[in-house]
UniProtKB/Swiss-Prot annotation:
Transit peptide: 1-34
Organism: Cryptococcus neoformans var. neoformans serotype D (strain JEC21 / ATCC MYA-565) (Filobasidiella neoformans)
Protein name: Large ribosomal subunit protein bL27m
One biological process term in Gene Ontology: translation
SUPFAM superfamilies, per database record: Ribosomal L27 protein-like
Amino acid sequence: MFLRPTSIPSAVSQIRAQLFAGPSSLASQIQVRWASKAAGGKSKNGRESAGRRLGVKRYGDQYVTPGTIIVRQRGANFHPGQNVAVGKDFTIYALQPGYVKFYQHHLPYPHLSRPDQPGPQNVPSVKRPRQFRQFVGIARDREDKLPRDERAVGRERRFWGWPKEKVEVVPEAAVESAAGIQA
């Protein structure tokens, strides 16, 4: 009833010997062909896909509203500056209404440099030196320049939907007459 443990390996070895024995074995009948040329080609694959419509969508000094896409890109060629944000696919879009400004700076936004950390020295006179990153920002007025020196000028504050205080201009004659009445 019970097989001896030594009988199982011998049966397996007999089957193995029958399958792979001699020149007419199964292993010698398998044909192997080595590729001398790539079957489908390599350099011409993947050209049927449409372009992804990348690039700058709004140029310098163009007016944009919040949510307007300014740059579509792969990777961070342009970095977000003042009043813009970057999406998960590196799309740069507007957060505030205003005019698009492209500029270069050696520090990441908000560009706050310390006195003990001077800017790059001996910058070569080329269009885009390596020390500088390209930034996109939005200025409120077309004449404004970016980057703003936020320490000297202060941070730009915008209050959306908040009613503006109306300051009444009182003529000087009315002030003098009111002072004369009280006296």
